[in-house]
Amino acid sequence: MTSCTITSAPGKVLVTGGYLVLEQAFWGCVVSTSSRFYTIIQAQSKPNHISVHSPQFEQADWTYVVTDDFKLKAVTLDSANKFVETALSFTLQLMVEKQGVGKVQEVLKTGLDITIVGDNDFYSQRPQLQAKNLSNTAEALASLDPFCSTHATLATVHKTGLGSSAALITSLVAGLLLHFGMVEDVTSEMSKRWIHNVAQFIHCFAQGKVGSGFDVSSAVWGSHLYKRFNPAILKPIMDEQVDSKLLLDTLHVDNTEWDNQVVPFNLPPGFDLVLADIDAGSHTPTLVSKVLNWKKTKPEEASLLWTELNECNSKVEARFRNLIRLSEQSPEEYKSTIELCSSRLFYQWSSAEGQVAVELLDLHDEFDRVRSLLRKMGELSDVPIEPKEQTQLLEACMQVPGVVMAGVPGAGGYDAIFCIVISERAKRDVRALWKSWKELSVGPLLSEADSNGITSPQTNQIPGLSRFIL
């Protein structure tokens, strides 16, 4: 145990595999972001007390007493946080079973003071910008203090769709396991599996359902190709009164029933992600339930479309891999082609010579086909996966030189878009387009692609974090 434990988990963007990742037959391509959640765990003076603070929110302080039988008793009764309480309760239960009563009691002697903060990109910063009389630009966002106040409660804040709940849960679970000594290094493969299994269960329990799990998976492993675990593994323990031995046996890293698959993935050199927050949110569970209802009532129609969509998703992933291979085999040709194509529109790339240009254009074309199939699925299921307003914006983004692809992440809807670009200039030009766009209120996020998963950083590595250290 150390006096101060810091853990961090990234947000995510599901580039391909929206809806399909719900089933074990299909892969999804998830890119983790530079925007991250941080959990800071420190000792406090009150034995067996756990205080949790979310300083970016109003009414976001919770205090608990750990009883003699390691149950959590809330001291603050005016508000509750299902995610935090679920994480603390089950993680304590698990650690007592795994490490024994003595070890856990030893750590709790000094109590725990837990602070959880997320990078600004997880939440819409429009209210802060308006209060400062600033326009919604990347430059204005960069001028805000790190981890700035949202001036909202957890219930009223506008999220940007980067997977805040999964990143929060994963960083908190990792922090607890590290602080209590159940894992020693969060970046080791064994530790990642512990963190994943525990965080996956807690996230599902807090949400009241077993989801696809790609968001927790990317919070642990960073960017990767993901194939989900069999949801049946969690069914026996989705119970508040779950037996401790059953809980440990189910979540144990030696349990071979955990059959999730993680294949490392990176964007090719010179590629980056640009994200936008759109001021018209979609409720993801509603979109998903409507699509699944269509799939249930029209199984043949859905199966044909999902099979074709999966093939197109696989082709997109293959193009990415081919470009990485070419960057290693012919680095000079790769670099010069990327530079040339970065100043041209996608349909002009065919005039560039060599295999790199061929793969680049094929990547665009394959992803365009993915978008077309997602729109078709939206029409058949009567779900706005890529609404017409988004289509117009995405097509305009594709008219910016150096933009390889533009789409709606994950389940789609109205609240976000992403572009993958091959130059800083393309990034600036896309953001300029968003600023001038009149049909929707489009604001940039500062997040970039960052393939790192769970980490345990030093305070001085993260600007603005030191103010939360006691």
Predicted regions: what they are:
Residues 1-16, 20-22, 30-113, 117-158, ...:
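C-terminal nucleotide
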Residues 167, 416-418:
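FabD-like malonyl-/acyl-CoA
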Residues 161-184:
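DPxDG-like acidic metal-binding loop motif
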